[in-house]
Curated annotation (Swiss-Prot):
GO terms for molecular function: undecaprenyl-diphosphatase activity. Its EC number is 3.6.1.27. It comes from Nitrosospira multiformis (strain ATCC 25196 / NCIMB 11849 / C 71). The chain crosses the membrane at residues 4-24, 43-63, 83-103, 109-129, 184-204, 218-238, 248-268. It catalyses: di-trans,octa-cis-undecaprenyl diphosphate + H2O = di-trans,octa-cis-undecaprenyl phosphate + phosphate + H(+). It is found in: Cell inner membrane. Bacitracin is thought to be involved in the inhibition of peptidoglycan synthesis by sequestering undecaprenyl diphosphate, thereby reducing the pool of lipid carrier available. The gene is uppP. One of its GO terms (biological process) is regulation of cell shape. This is Undecaprenyl-diphosphatase. Belongs to the UppP family. Catalyzes the dephosphorylation of undecaprenyl diphosphate (UPP). Confers resistance to bacitracin.
Amino acid sequence: MDWFLLLKGLILGIVEGLTEFLPISSTGHLILVSDLLNFNDEKGKVFTIVIQLGAILAVCWEYRVKLRHVVTDIGSRQDANRFVLNLLIAFLPAAILGLLFIKTIKQYLFHPVPVALAFIVGGLLILWAERRPHVVDVERVEDMDWKHALKVGLAQCLALIPGTSRSGATIIGGLFFGLSRKAATEFSFFLAIPVMFAATFYDLYKNRDILHLDDASVFAIGFVASFISALLAVRGLLRFVSQHDFSVFAWYRIGFGIIVLITAYSGMVQWSG
């Protein structure tokens, strides 16, 4: 058994779980950390896809009561029907663009320097958004209409650029379009479920020949680590947004992006790409 490989799996699982639902880009962090750990070959890339399932299930577990009510009330309650329709509307823009451009995006942007630039730009956008007057039109996720959902879905398209952050794009987009912090954050969590399930299973299907039973242990460790750390991150973020804005994440993104650029151009770290 390769204990160092298991350690890599544990580290990446924790990174995925902690960053997936924070506005700091899990994809960007996984690209950078995988590069540092020299786990960026084809198997490593499939691994980073598989461990996303742990993070998705963490959200499903945290909101299991609400999701169960939605499933059982579809067709009989208007609020459940509207909730599902809003998720579908918000899901479609990024899904369509992703299918059209994902190969090009992975070829040119899944590298440390483009990710670092996206970190910085995303951080600046968060600071700008936080300094705008915030007019709240929607206090609860249940009060959203299809127009709010479509706007958040269009904002999510920015997250196709690695380093941008899916949660960052949807949460800040939600704030920009009149959602309260709690509503924007929760809708981002719910929207992650169809988006990440679709992206994960699509990538797994495309790379099914790379998966082997010999890798089950490292994949399992990464999956469990992702689930536990994501559950903690989701609960922590909900408490955080009730009392703070997102500026701290913006400064983290900017600082981290600058460090990556400095290490890349100074030769301190031999990043790939």
